C-alpha cells in the first residue's frame, strides 16, 4: 500500500469516527429532550415483527398474513348485511380469549348483546360506549388508546359519527365536509398513540354511491379520504351467496378482499361461511384449507380423510369434523404446519363456490344436504 493510499484510508476512518461521535451525541440529545424511544435504529427496535390478532376465520388470517396487525388502524367496509359487525365481534372474542381487553364504540346504537355472546364475546367484560356525537365517540377512542390498557377498539360505524354541529342544527341544514374534517383531525391525533400503545382500532364503514360516475366504480366510503390513508389494512367484505338447506336459509358465504395492506402482500381474497346466530364457521374455513392442501380429498360430493370417506356434501363433512374433535384438531395442526412451510393455496384462500361447473355442483349439494 502506497503512502497516498494509506493517508486516504486513515482520513476516511477518522471522518467515520467523527460522524459516529456526532451521531451518538445528537441521538442522546434527542432522547433527553423528547424521551427514550423517540428515535432509534430500526435494527434496535424491540418489535421488528408486527404482532397480529386472529380474525376468527383461518382463511382470512392467511390472507392478512396472520390477522389484524397490532398497533394499527384497520377499516372494514361493505354493503349492508355483509358481515362487518360479525367480523369485528369475532376479533373481540379472540382478544378476550387471550386475556385482552376490548371496547366497542356503538355509534349506530345497534349492538345485540345476545348475538355477541353467541359468537363467544364475554359481554360482561366488554367495554361499550354509545356516544351522542362524533366528537364524543372519537374522544373516547383517544382516551382508551392513551390508557394503554385496551387491546382492541371497534368503532361501528364511521357513517354514524355525526358531528355536533349537525346534531344541534335543524333537519335539512347543510354542514358540508364536517364529517370528513372530524375524521381527518381524529386520525392525526390518535395514529401516533395507537402505534405506541399497541392497540388495534377497527373502523367499520358503509358504502355510498358517487353521483354522475359513468365509468369506473361509483362506490365510495363515508368520512372523506383520511381513513383510507391512515389505515394499514382495508377490507372489502361482500355477500356472494346465500346458504340454504332446501328452502331454508341458514347463512351466507362472505368474500373479503384485502384492498390495502401495509404489513403483508395486499389484494388477497378470503372466503368463509357466516351462519345465522352462530357467526363465522371456523370448521368450514378449516375444511376449505384442508381441501386446498390435499389433507382432505374431495371426489364429487364425497370428502375423504386418510382414504376413508367422512361425509357426503360439505355440510355433512363439517358436522363429522365437529363430532370428531381429535381428528379435527389433528387436521388443523397439519394445515397450519403446511401453510407455515409455504404451501400455496388459490389466492391464499378458496375460490368462489360457483367459479366453475364442478364447484357449481357442489354448491347445489350444500343447499340440499341436511
UniProtKB/Swiss-Prot annotation:
Main location per the UniProt record: cytoplasm
Residue numbers spanned by region Disordered: 1-20
Cellular localisation: Cytoplasm
This protein's record includes keyword Transmembrane helix: no
Gene3D superfamilies: P-loop containing nucleotide triphosphate hydrolases
Residues given in the record as ATP binding sites: 78-85
Keyword field: ATP-binding, Cytoplasm, DNA damage, DNA recombination, DNA repair, DNA-binding, Nucleotide-binding, SOS response
HAMAP family reported for this sequence: RecA
Organism phylogeny: Bacteria, Bacillati, Cyanobacteriota, Cyanophyceae, Synechococcales
Membrane-spanning ranges: none
GO molecular function: ATP binding; ATP hydrolysis activity; ATP-dependent DNA damage sensor activity; damaged DNA binding; single-stranded DNA binding
Listed GO biological process terms: DNA recombination; DNA repair; SOS response
Protein name, entry field: Protein RecA
Record-level GO cellular component terms: cytosol
Protein family (similarity comment): Belongs to the RecA family.
Organism: Prochlorococcus marinus (strain MIT 9515)
Domain of life of the native organism: Bacteria
Protein role: Can catalyze the hydrolysis of ATP in the presence of single-stranded DNA, the ATP-dependent uptake of single-stranded DNA by duplex DNA, and the ATP-dependent hybridization of homologous single-stranded DNAs. It interacts with LexA causing its activation and leading to its autocatalytic cleavage.
InterPro entries in the record: AAA+_ATPase, DNA_recomb/repair_RecA, DNA_recomb/repair_RecA_CS, P-loop_NTPase, RecA-like_C, RecA-like_N, RecA_ATP-bd, RecA_C_sf
Amino acid at each position: 500500500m502506497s503512502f497516498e493510499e494509506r493517508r486516504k484510508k486513515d482520513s476516511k476512518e477518522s471522518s467515520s469516527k467523527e460522524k459516529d461521535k456526532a451521531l451518538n451525541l445528537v441521538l442522546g440529545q434527542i432522547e433527553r429532550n423528547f424521551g427514550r424511544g423517540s428515535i432509534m435504529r430500526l435494527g434496535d427496535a424491540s418489535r421488528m415483527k408486527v404482532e397480529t390478532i386472529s380474525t376468527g376465520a383461518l382463511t382470512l388470517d392467511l390472507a392478512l398474513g396472520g390477522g389484524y396487525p397490532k398497533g394499527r388502524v384497520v377499516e372494514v367496509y361493505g354493503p349492508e348485511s355483509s358481515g362487518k359487525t360479525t367480523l369485528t365481534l369475532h376479533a373481540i372474542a379472540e382478544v378476550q380469549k387471550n386475556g385482552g381487553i376490548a371496547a366497542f364504540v356503538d355509534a349506530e346504537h345497534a349492538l345485540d348483546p345476545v348475538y355477541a355472546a353467541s359468537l363467544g364475546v364475554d359481554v360482561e367484560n366488554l367495554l361499550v360506549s354509545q356516544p351522542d356525537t362524533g366528537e364524543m365517540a372519537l374522544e373516547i377512542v383517544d382516551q382508551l388508546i392513551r390508557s394503554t390498557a385496551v387491546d382492541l377498539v371497534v368503532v361501528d360505524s364511521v357513517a354514524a359519527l355525526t358531528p355536533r354541529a349537525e346534531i344541534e342544527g335543524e333537519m335539512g341544514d347543510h354542514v358540508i365536509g364536517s364529517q370528513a374534517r372530524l375524521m381527518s383531525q381524529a386520525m392525526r391525533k390518535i395514529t401516533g398513540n395507537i402505534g405506541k400503545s399497541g392497540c388495534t382500532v377497527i373502523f367499520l364503514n358503509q358504502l355510498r354511491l358517487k353521483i354522475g360516475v359513468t365509468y369506473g366504480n361509483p362506490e365510495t366510503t363515508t368520512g372523506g379520504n383520511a381513513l383510507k390513508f391512515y389505515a394499514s389494512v382495508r377490507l372489502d367484505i361482500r355477500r356472494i351467496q346465500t346458504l340454504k338447506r332446501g328452502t331454508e336459509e341458514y347463512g351466507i358465504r362472505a368474500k373479503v378482499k384485502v384492498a390495502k395492506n401495509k404489513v403483508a402482500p395486499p389484494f388477497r381474497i378470503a372466503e368463509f361461511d357466516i351462519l345465522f346466530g352462530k357467526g363465522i364457521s371456523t370448521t368450514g374455513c378449516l375444511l376449505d384449507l384442508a381441501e386446498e392442501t390435499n389433507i382432505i380429498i374431495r371426489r364429487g360430493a364425497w370428502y375423504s380423510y386418510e382414504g376413508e370417506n367422512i361425509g357426503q356434501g360439505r355440510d355433512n363433512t363439517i358436522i363429522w369434523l365437529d363430532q370428531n374433535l381429535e381428528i379435527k384438531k389433528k387436521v388443523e395442526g397439519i394445515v397450519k404446519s403446511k401453510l407455515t412451510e409455504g404451501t400455496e393455496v388459490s389466492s391464499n384462500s378458496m375460490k368462489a363456490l360457483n367459479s366453475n361447473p364442478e364447484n357449481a355442483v357442489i354448491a347445489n349439494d350444500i343447499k340440499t344436504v341436511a
